Amino acid sequence: MIGLDTNVVLRFVLQDDIGQSPRSTALFDSLSPQSPGYISIVTLAELAWVFDRTYRKPRNEIAVLLRGLLESNDLVLENHDAVAQALRRFDSSNADFSDCLIERLCASGGCSRTMTFDVGAAKSAGMVLL
């Protein structure tokens, strides 16, 4: 298994760098179920944030990207079930993916609720306003 940093995944998905994109594509092409790539929770959160804030991608494109990673047989995602649940909430709400992910990770860790000062996260991501 090979760990994949955010910038490697971005270069593969965006194909926007003449030097790095072909190298990331070659790496992704070499992945298989027997030798998968590993994507951490931090990488997923960074990907969603960069797509939203830097590239101004619409929510549906962010969801398609995340779903593609989640469903790939050549990738292992950290805490796959919590990521899938967070993506479902992201699809059905106005919450940021990071907020959905935080709430689902807390729930999978045994938390009865996740407290926040973020009014939007309390309304859309299932958190409780402190």
Language model: regions and residue ranges:
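Acidic, PIN/NYN-like endoribonuclease modules and their adjacent C-terminal/linker elements
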Residues: 1, 103-130
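Acidic catalytic patch
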Residues: 16, 41, 64-92
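Alpha-helix capping/helix-boundary segments
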Residues: 8, 43, 82, 101-102, ...
